[in-house]
Amino acid sequence: IWYVMSDIFVTHDQVVQTDGDIKKLTLADNSQITFNEKSSLSYPESFPGRERRVALKGEAFFAIAKNPEKPFIISTESGEIKVLGTRFNVKETTNPSGIEVLVEEGRVSFQTKSKDAVHILSAGDKLILNNTTSQMLIQHKSNMNDLVWFTHSLEYVNAKLGTVVSD
């Protein structure tokens, strides 16, 4: 894969996941990415331009190294997530086609592929976009148990037993 960034050709590496595997990767800028199964990321060996850009298919948790001069941008089929330094999860969904962005710490912006909307998400916010209907939902104070694949733990406060058992 070749990308043109400021008239510089950058070769991209790719991490591809298989069934049942969770893999960790540290990028050249010290950003850390944990991939869920069946996920892939296209990324450059280094970030020579004015931005740090990667492309994600599937689901990954990002802990992005802060660098205000070089925003970190994640491209997906549904849109782009832009961040300066934070921790968040991105999950592409297939049925229905769409994306979920859950922010654990900091703030990110999400811009739809058609560039008709930009949404700022803060810690605890979850954006859900259905590509088929173009319906978007933003939940505040979201359930961080959605990160169980990454954290390996569930947390409940005043929850009903049925909710705990079903999770």
Task: Give the location of each predicted region.
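A residue-level detector for the "anchor" residue at the start of short, highly conserved motifs
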Residues: 1-167
